[in-house]
């Protein structure tokens, strides 16, 4: 197993241009596929999740051209649902942002499709989405465990009608259903069961759908109306924002050991909810400066916070490790969906924080972190989870340094993360 030793960093200073958002990249690729016309996507993320989506689209007959650095994609839209005359098997790795939307999109046309992935993907639930698609007439069959991939889709189109979908587990299910509803055979009315988690991710979806010419009537995130007769039309060019979750590590670095750190590609005009991470840092005491497309974080004495972070679930992980440098006990609440991500992030975070001496209380949907007097070095397991690896890079700011096991798992969203992180040291 590869390991990366991070020695103590005493100060950070500099600017980081954040790579494209994973969530926006895969949503935009699918909408561009369904749209009329050719779309040029710029600042596309070059990572594992995007490669799985691109490979699947190519297998399904979608034509696109990638730039040499794979951050610009010119894609010829189908202007129609995806159809296939032969059975297709698509391998999607552990890419939830490909599995969920493709599962929904492939019900729109005609053909037989098998969706599969890595072993961890077979542990990530998809039942709430499948239940909703079945209410609209989709024929979806599980191949192993009920409610989980792999699965088979026998597509004949999606009916109009009223549909209920659970909102309390993952916003990706609703995102997938929203994106395909305009191409159903009539009006679709979606009712949310339970509390909708991660609402800002739904805002990303709605903003992108609007960019491609489709309107959704949003009744306070409890009901959504999608009128028939709409179609996706390419806007010509789509700029993929920087990944706000990935910005969180550099903003935390500035707050802990700045100097100042400036991240570009996200800012006050961002459509991503995870930019609110900067507000949490500010509540902890950091000095934050906002621009339209940048955020600056400056060093400060950090204090613990007690907050509901359901709206920023990915970026909230960075607060858990930043808490090691704050005074007091930090409480991160309403984050049950950490458990169904690339790994069970609540259990993994608690285990690894304890290795460095933190006192941790892990509950059903919360985690509390009390920092040790002095963190001690450890070998941090990353669970093939990119965000675990990046979060624990914060331990380079402790006097002991840290060893990251399997650092290359960051390839899911940020392949050169550790090089960019090291470049800030001064």
UniProtKB/Swiss-Prot annotation:
InterPro entries: Enolpyruvate_Tfrase_dom, Enolpyruvate_Tfrase_sf, EPSP_synthase, EPSP_synthase_CS, RNA3'P_cycl/enolpyr_Trfase_a/b
Gene: aroA
Pathway involvement of the protein, from the record: Metabolic intermediate biosynthesis; chorismate biosynthesis; chorismate from D-erythrose 4-phosphate and phosphoenolpyruvate: step 6/7
Subcellular location, record wording: Cytoplasm
Binding positions for phosphoenolpyruvate per the UniProt entry: 22, 96, 124, 172, 345, 387, 412
Enzyme Commission identifier(s): 2.5.1.19
Stated role: Catalyzes the transfer of the enolpyruvyl moiety of phosphoenolpyruvate (PEP) to the 5-hydroxyl of shikimate-3-phosphate (S3P) to produce enolpyruvyl shikimate-3-phosphate and inorganic phosphate.
Keywords attached to this entry: Amino-acid biosynthesis, Aromatic amino acid biosynthesis, Cytoplasm, Transferase
Lineage: Bacteria, Pseudomonadati, Pseudomonadota, Gammaproteobacteria, Alteromonadales
Matching Gene3D superfamilies: Enolpyruvate transferase domain
Record field: catalytic activity: 3-phosphoshikimate + phosphoenolpyruvate = 5-O-(1-carboxyvinyl)-3-phosphoshikimate + phosphate
GO BP terms, alphabetized: amino acid biosynthetic process; aromatic amino acid family biosynthetic process; chorismate biosynthetic process
MF terms (GO), sorted A to Z: 3-phosphoshikimate 1-carboxyvinyltransferase activity
NCBIfam families (UniProt xref): aroA
GO cellular component terms given for this protein: cytoplasm
Self-association and partners: Monomer.
Protein name per Swiss-Prot or TrEMBL: 3-phosphoshikimate 1-carboxyvinyltransferase
Annotated positions binding 3-phosphoshikimate: 22-23, 27, 170-172, 198, 314, 337, 341
Broadest EC class assigned to this enzyme: transferase
Organism the protein comes from: Shewanella woodyi (strain ATCC 51908 / MS32)
Active site annotation, chain numbering: 314 (proton acceptor)
Family classification: Belongs to the EPSP synthase family.
